[in-house]
Amino acid sequence: MSSDLKSRFLQVYDTLKSELINDPAFEFDDDSRQWVEKMLDYNVPGGKLNRGLSVIDSYQLLKGGELTDNEIFLAAALGWCIEWLQAYFLVLDDIMDESHTRRGQPCWFRLPKVGMIAANDGIILRNNVPRILKKHFRGKPYYVDLLDLFNEVEFQTASGQMIDLITTLVGEKDLSKYSLSIHRRIVQYKTAYYSFYLPVACALLMFGEDLEKHEEVKNVLVEMGTYFQVQDDYLDCFGAPEVIGKIGTDIEDFKCSWLVVKALELSNEEQKKILHENYGKKDPSSVAKVKELYHTLNLQGVFEDYENTSYKKLITSIEGHPSKAVQAVLKSFLGKIYKRQK
């Protein structure tokens, strides 16, 4: 991804933001316009923008040539719709998880003037997506498919978040509920569909493809999303906070993390007892005991094995795809995340 394309992508953000804060469906005054602008700037463009940029990347690989200015704009607008969706999830997620930082700064709801207004801001972020789609895609033959796609992926993500929340109910900390299959279900729905399938599906629709003919592409991307989340779980504990932009709290939050699931699988009775007694507790000594056990069980080595095996499996699946252009899209995705540090 050239820095030129990234700067063009960011220019499209400014255009979309300006359209949204001048949306004729609502009479903005100075206060509301300033609020929304500040809220958007704080929550939408601050991440790595991988999901959004991937739409342009994927479309370019499918087309196989130079993109027109209009194609770049439309692919970027779809990319920003995904970033908006992500911002909406994260703003509400941070409230539910009582998080403190996100992307190296305080969570939006932690700002003194924001608080629980953040819940409504999340709803506004979510409602910005169909406004953008309507303005720029209403005349396109794939408009209805786009709306269906965003609605379905949002439903899948919210349902994944639900399984995550009800499985990690802090009131009844029951580690025996945690297994690789539960972890996989949470990850698939909560992360893989919107982070991996959605950007490629947007590019395929824009390219005139029928998504029903690309089930195997969806399957590979969901596998990739699972691999990505396992990396995330690993980095939450073993990554450097200054590199990943947040302080990991999966242990304190009793998260159904790949690490704890693997630890349960590899532990003897004595070690299981340590997990049951310390996992999900806020005090630093409990967290330290869990981390120490992770080291004892060599979860770093177990993760490296997992990473290598997953990579080989994914490459094999990708190379089985009949279209070289689709292979290129999938390989470009995999290349971005393989052995990442943040």
UniProtKB/Swiss-Prot annotation:
<protein>
    <recommendedName>
        <fullName>Farnesyl pyrophosphate synthase 1</fullName>
        <ecNumber>2.5.1.10</ecNumber>
        <ecNumber>2.5.1.1</ecNumber>
    </recommendedName>
</protein>
<keyword id="KW-0963">Cytoplasm</keyword>
<dbReference type="GO" id="GO:0004337">
    <property type="term" value="F:(2E,6E)-farnesyl diphosphate synthase activity"/>
</dbReference>
<dbReference type="GO" id="GO:0045337">
    <property type="term" value="P:farnesyl diphosphate biosynthetic process"/>
</dbReference>
<feature type="binding site">
    <location>
        <position position="93"/>
    </location>
    <ligand>
        <name>Mg(2+) 1</name>
    </ligand>
</feature>
<keyword id="KW-1207">Sterol metabolism</keyword>
<feature type="binding site">
    <location>
        <position position="255"/>
    </location>
    <ligand>
        <name>dimethylallyl diphosphate</name>
    </ligand>
</feature>
<keyword id="KW-0443">Lipid metabolism</keyword>
<dbReference type="InterPro" id="IPR039702">
    <property type="entry name" value="FPS1-like"/>
</dbReference>
<keyword id="KW-0414">Isoprene biosynthesis</keyword>
<feature type="binding site">
    <location>
        <position position="93"/>
    </location>
    <ligand>
        <name>Mg(2+) 2</name>
    </ligand>
</feature>
<dbReference type="GO" id="GO:0004161">
    <property type="term" value="F:dimethylallyltranstransferase activity"/>
</dbReference>
<dbReference type="GO" id="GO:0046872">
    <property type="term" value="F:metal ion binding"/>
</dbReference>
<dbReference type="Pfam" id="PF00348">
    <property type="entry name" value="polyprenyl_synt"/>
</dbReference>
<feature type="binding site">
    <location>
        <position position="97"/>
    </location>
    <ligand>
        <name>Mg(2+) 1</name>
    </ligand>
</feature>
<feature type="binding site">
    <location>
        <position position="229"/>
    </location>
    <ligand>
        <name>dimethylallyl diphosphate</name>
    </ligand>
</feature>
<feature type="binding site">
    <location>
        <position position="51"/>
    </location>
    <ligand>
        <name>isopentenyl diphosphate</name>
    </ligand>
</feature>
<dbReference type="GO" id="GO:0005737">
    <property type="term" value="C:cytoplasm"/>
</dbReference>
<keyword id="KW-0479">Metal-binding</keyword>
<keyword id="KW-0752">Steroid biosynthesis</keyword>
<keyword id="KW-0808">Transferase</keyword>
<dbReference type="InterPro" id="IPR008949">
    <property type="entry name" value="Isoprenoid_synthase_dom_sf"/>
</dbReference>
<feature type="binding site">
    <location>
        <position position="191"/>
    </location>
    <ligand>
        <name>dimethylallyl diphosphate</name>
    </ligand>
</feature>
<keyword id="KW-0460">Magnesium</keyword>
<keyword id="KW-0153">Cholesterol metabolism</keyword>
<feature type="binding site">
    <location>
        <position position="190"/>
    </location>
    <ligand>
        <name>dimethylallyl diphosphate</name>
    </ligand>
</feature>
<feature type="binding site">
    <location>
        <position position="97"/>
    </location>
    <ligand>
        <name>Mg(2+) 2</name>
    </ligand>
</feature>
<feature type="binding site">
    <location>
        <position position="102"/>
    </location>
    <ligand>
        <name>dimethylallyl diphosphate</name>
    </ligand>
</feature>
<feature type="binding site">
    <location>
        <position position="48"/>
    </location>
    <ligand>
        <name>isopentenyl diphosphate</name>
    </ligand>
</feature>
<feature type="binding site">
    <location>
        <position position="103"/>
    </location>
    <ligand>
        <name>isopentenyl diphosphate</name>
    </ligand>
</feature>
<keyword id="KW-0444">Lipid biosynthesis</keyword>
<comment type="pathway">
    <text>Isoprenoid biosynthesis; geranyl diphosphate biosynthesis; geranyl diphosphate from dimethylallyl diphosphate and isopentenyl diphosphate: step 1/1.</text>
</comment>
<feature type="binding site">
    <location>
        <position position="86"/>
    </location>
    <ligand>
        <name>isopentenyl diphosphate</name>
    </ligand>
</feature>
<comment type="function">
    <text>Catalyzes the sequential condensation of isopentenyl pyrophosphate with the allylic pyrophosphates, dimethylallyl pyrophosphate, and then with the resultant geranylpyrophosphate to the ultimate product farnesyl pyrophosphate.</text>
</comment>
<dbReference type="InterPro" id="IPR033749">
    <property type="entry name" value="Polyprenyl_synt_CS"/>
</dbReference>
<dbReference type="GO" id="GO:0006695">
    <property type="term" value="P:cholesterol biosynthetic process"/>
</dbReference>
<dbReference type="GO" id="GO:0033384">
    <property type="term" value="P:geranyl diphosphate biosynthetic process"/>
</dbReference>
<keyword id="KW-0753">Steroid metabolism</keyword>
<keyword id="KW-0756">Sterol biosynthesis</keyword>
<comment type="similarity">
    <text>Belongs to the FPP/GGPP synthase family.</text>
</comment>
<keyword id="KW-0152">Cholesterol biosynthesis</keyword>
<feature type="binding site">
    <location>
        <position position="246"/>
    </location>
    <ligand>
        <name>dimethylallyl diphosphate</name>
    </ligand>
</feature>
